[in-house]
Curated annotation (Swiss-Prot):
It comes from Aotus nancymaae (Ma's night monkey). Residues 78-101 are annotated as: Lipoprotein lipase cofactor. GO terms for molecular function: phospholipase activator activity; phospholipase binding. Pfam families: Apo-CII (PF05355). This is Apolipoprotein C-II. It is found in: Secreted. InterPro entries: Apo-CII (IPR008019), ApoC-II_dom_sf (IPR023121). It comes from the Eukaryota. Residues 66-74 are annotated as: Lipid binding. One of its GO terms (cellular component) is very-low-density lipoprotein particle. Disulfide bonds: none annotated. Component of chylomicrons, very low-density lipoproteins (VLDL), low-density lipoproteins (LDL), and high-density lipoproteins (HDL) in plasma. Plays an important role in lipoprotein metabolism as an activator of lipoprotein lipase. Both proapolipoprotein C-II and apolipoprotein C-II can activate lipoprotein lipase.
Amino acid sequence: MGTRFLLALFLVLLVLGFEVQGAHLPQQEESASPALLTQMQESLSSYWDSAKAAASKLYQKTYLPTVDEKLRDMYSKSTAAMSTYAGILTDQVLSMLKGEE
């Protein structure tokens, strides 16, 4: 599973790298900064969409029901553990803030 994760991460970074190389914009005046912000938001959104599409394609290509079941089981166990530890941490912080009575 580790190699699949690394492969997916590599492909996402590769897609983002090619997108960044192709997005050379000429310099604009400072009065056009709202347009620059809009362009940056649009380019970040397109990068995110392309990364999601690449990850989805990779997931669909390498889909295995047993791996999917194991991932779902790991997710449910880890979220249960994290909620337990978050509750303990919250209690500790509240007791420190409240002080001894």
